[in-house]
Amino acid sequence: AMIYTTNQQEALDYRDGNLLIIACAGSGKTQVLSRRIALLVSEGVPKESIIAFTFTDMAAGELKSRIRKELASLREEGRIDDASLGEIYIGTIHSFSLQLLKEIHPSYRNYDIIDEKRQAAIIVSKYLDFGLDKLQGANSKIETIRRFIETLNIIYRENLDVDNFKNQDLINSVHQYQNFIKQRPNCFLTFDEIIAELTSVIESNEAIRAQVQNRFTNIFVDEYQDVDDRQEQLIRLLSNDGQTAVVCAVGDDDQAIYRFRGATVTNILTFENRYPSVKRITLSTNFRSSHAIVEIANAAVSGQRIGRRNILGLHRRLPKTMKAQHYNVATNQFEETMAEHGDVWNCTFSSENQEANFIADRIQELLGIPWNSAGTLRGLSYADMSILCRSLNYTKAITDELDRRNIPYIIKGSKGLFESAEIKVVHAAFCLLFDSQYVTPDPNQFDRYTFYDEAATRD
């Protein structure tokens, strides 16, 4: 049986109101989340009344797997008969919003999500129709398109009224775009628009609002620190401000990394001010790392000095100190996970090549070292190691050194949308269609592109 810390057990047992779980890195939050949901089912909470929002589809898959495991465990104990997930919703807030929107408002049943690439292709193909050539302030067409897409995202995330803008050309362009993607045969909604549309429908229709608020009893929100204002508005609507449904928010303000997408750490910092009867529980035990790694992480987020460097900390954060522990079966206690030599290196290099040599040396030193992986002792492999870089532009010296030593690697990451492989392939295809010379996409030479007007629209 799983052994829980005092705080983890408290998070599992609390039933007297809304819950804010501050979960430090490696603190077992997914285990606590899945166990709490399974326990609610065993207590008779209808599965169809439970929502679990995750930030990604991958996280949703992991949570589903964990909940199934916990439900199966409860069935073996004789506490439930059915170990299936049933109609528990586990997934992203965008997918949930589209699903619910189609269910409560038939006119949206033909709509589909428009992803970033298709949105960009539509805007490119309808550049003149949308009047984007009239917009000022950009140095090129591609820069105009980038700014227009970002403007659209901000409009929906921040719930802005387009008609209040001072730039009439921008107002016209936004309306032209909105009318185009929502008319047949397109019927598209962006990720941000989906939430905006659902929020609008619930707010404007009292009967639908009452129906939705009576339907759900428990709303779980993972990675709550990355929730933006529009998403928070929807969560409050679904839960009637935490009065008809219990909101269990799980996150860590120290791990907020999506502010560039509109997420605001303020939501997690002020959760207790917006919802009634909130209990805050902090899961501060890191089961993943040693003391040295946790110590440097604590120093980073609290603004302490590390060596000769000042590490930038958050000006406002929830008080917490992460600790490194593991459960010792022999003593039946949680004990500190002590640091080992080499857990943390703080190095300064005179050149990129010197840094690359150090990294390659460490990889070769670590290869084959005995490692306890989920109870199985094995040697470390290349697949157990990763190199984090500021951007793909900083990888060449490292990859050159890895190549020289025949160390296998895979580069993962994303380039800009208009420099992506997909866009290059589409561009090449259009060049073939129009018997035009293929030119590698260059943001500064966007005038040389030719696009087929119907390429991005639905068949």
Cite the ranges covered by each PLM segment.
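Conserved helicase NTPase motor core
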Residues: 2-13, 17-22, 59, 89, ...
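Alpha-helical scaffold elements adjacent to nucleotide-binding pockets in ATP/GTP-utilizing enzyme cores
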Residues: 36, 62-70, 96-100, 122-126, ...
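Helicase P-loop NTPase motor core
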Residues: 27-30, 277-279, 285-407, 434-437
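Short glycine-/polar-rich loops that comprise or flank the Walker A/P-loop
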Residues: 17, 45-49, 84-87, 243-245, ...
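ATP-hydrolysis module of ASCE/P-loop NTPase motor domains
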Residues: 14-15, 83-87, 105-192, 216, ...
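ATPase/helicase motor core of nucleic-acid motors
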Residues: 245, 274-275, 339, 379-459
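P-loop NTPase Walker
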Residues: 1-107, 210, 353
